[in-house]
Amino acid sequence: MRNYKFIWVLVLSILMLGGVNSCSSENSEPEVDTFDVDFVLPAGIDTQKGGIVSFVVRDGKAPETTDLMYFTTDDGISRSCTITETSSASFSVKLSNGIVEGDYSVSLKRGSRRKEFGKTHITFVKQVEFTPDEGTTVWGVVSCGDKGVANVVVSDGYLTTTTNTDGIYQLKSEKTWGYVFISIPSGYEVSSKGVLPQFYTTLKSDAKTLERADFTLAKVEGQDNFRMYIFGDMHLANRTNDKAQFKVFTNDLNKYLDSHKSGKSYGLTLGDMTWDLYWYSRGYEFPQYLDEINSQVSGLQIFHTMGNHDNDFKAKNDFDAAFQYVRDIAPTYYSYNIGQIHFIVLDDIDCSDYDGTESRNYEKNFTSDQLDWLLQDLSYVDKSTPLVITTHAQIFYPKGNNSFALDGQVIERWPNTKKLLNILKGYTVHFVTGHTHTIFNALPSETAPLGAENVFEHNAGSICASWWWSGYLTPGVYVSLDGAPAGYSIWEFAGKDIKWKYKAVGMDENYQFRAYDLNNVSFSYSDVPNISTSTKVQNAFDYYVKAYPKNSNNEVLINIWNWNSNWKLSVTDETGKELKWTQTVAYD
C-alpha cells in the first residue's frame, strides 16, 4: 500500500518571475518531434509550489536530464522546468515558481525538438502523513483555515461518508458521476465561482486510480437568521426579448437585496434556467445563462435545481442528458445546511426514454439510486431538523378548492414518490417546486391523505411568467398561466421558524392580489377583430367569452396568487361593510 501525503489547499497568487522560472520567450516554436520518450501523465498532480514531481516511465523510455519539461496554460503562457533525476523506471521534475494551480498542456523539449504528452491539472497542497485504506479511489480533506473540519458529509452521489477528526474523508468510489461533493455544514460557506457555490469538484482520473479532492470552508456567523431567494423557471433562450425582460427581474432583485442587507442571503433556482430546444437552434446554453446572470447579479450564492429543459434532448439516456448540466452547473442531486435548516436538491425528471429527438419523452420520477443516496444523507440529519427540498416538477397537484392529488396520478410514478414520502416520515418537510408556471401551496392537512406526513408543498411561480410571451406581446406586463405576476419567492428563516412570501417583479412586496369588478369585465369576439383564425386560438379565447359575459351582479373576482387554506381573508366594500366571499376556480 502506498503512503500518501495529507494535503491542505493553498490560496496562491500568480507570480511572474524572471530567469529560469519566467515565461518562455523563444521567438520561434520548437520543431514538433517524436523522440523516444514515454511516461504516464496523470490527469491531476497534487504538489507544492516549486515542488518536485515524479513521473512513471513507460517501457524504459526515460527523458534525459538535459531535456526541459514545459507546462503551458490554455492562453499560451509556458513555464520551463528542469529534470532533476531520471532512470529507466521514473524521473523527477522541479516545478518552476511561476507555475500556479490550473490546467496545463505538458511537453518535453530536447534541443529544437518538442514532444507533446497531453494535459494535466496542478493543485497545490500541504503535506501531512496519511495512508488511505486499500480500495480507496477518492480521498481528501475538508478544511477551514489551517484546520480540518470533522463530521462533514461527503458523497459521490452513490456512497456517503463523513470526515474524521482531522477533516479527512475517503471513498471507494466507482466515479460514475465523475465528481464528489460535500453537504456544506451549518455555520460555514464555500467559495463562489460567479453565483455558483463551489461545493463539488470534478474528478480527473479513472475509477482505478487513487486521487485527491479537497474542499475549503469559510466560517460564518449569524447564519441562524437568513433569507433565501427562490427563482422559478427562467427559460432563457435569447428569443422573445427574454434577455431584456430578465434584466427587469435582476434589477428588481438587486434593488430588494440592496434594501435588505441585514442578515445572510442566498439564492436557489427551481430548474429550467435554459431551454434545451434552443441550445442548438439559438446557441444559448448554460455558459450563456451563466454569463447572463453573473453579469447582473453579484454577492449572492445561488444553488441550482435541474429542470426538464436543462436536459440535452439529443441524448438517449438519463445520464447523458444531464451531462452538460453537471459539467457547467452542479450535481443533479445534493444537500447543504444553512443555519438550522437542511436543504436537499433532487432531480425528478427521468430521461431514460430519450431517443435523441425533440420528442423529449421524460417521466416525472425519482431514480432508485437517488433515493438510496437520500437515505444515506438523512442518516446524518436529526428528525427535529426542518427539511427544505427542491425538485423541478411538482409532487402534488390541485384538484379543486383545497384538495390535492399526487401529481397527475401517474401510476408509474407512485412507487418512487411514495417511497420518497416514506423516507421523509418523521421530518417536517417543505417541498419547493416549479415547472407549472403557476403558484399553489399544499399544507400537511391536505397532503396527509396522500401518504405524506408533515409535508408542505410550495409551487413557487416563475421568473419568465408565460415563457416571456406576455411581456413580449405587451411590454411591461408579465403574467403567468394562473394570472399571477412573474416573480420570485422570499423565504425568511429564524432558527427553525420559516416564513415565505411571493414578490412580483417590478411591484412593491405588498402587492399580493389583483381584484376585478365583474360589472366592468366581459369578453367578446368584437374585442379582438384581428384574432387568429386558428382553431386552437379561437377555442382558447372562447373559454374567456363563456366565462365572462356582460353582467351586473355586483361581484368582485380576487386573484390571491400565494393563497393557502390557513389564511384568513376579509373583504370590505367602500363603506367598510364586510362582504361574504366564496373560493372559486376561474380564468384570469
What is each model feature region?
Residues 18-22:
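C-terminal motif of bacterial Sec signal peptides marking the signal peptidase cleavage site
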Residues 26-67, 115-128:
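Beta-strand/beta-sandwich contexts
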Residues 64-66, 135-158:
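Short, ordered, surface-exposed loop/turn motifs in non-cytosolic proteins
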Residues 83-85, 158-173:
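Short, acidic Ser/Thr/Gly-rich low-complexity loop/linker segments typical of extracellular
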Residues 144, 215-221, 234-237, 325-406, ...:
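Conserved catalytic scaffold of divalent metal-dependent phosphoesterases
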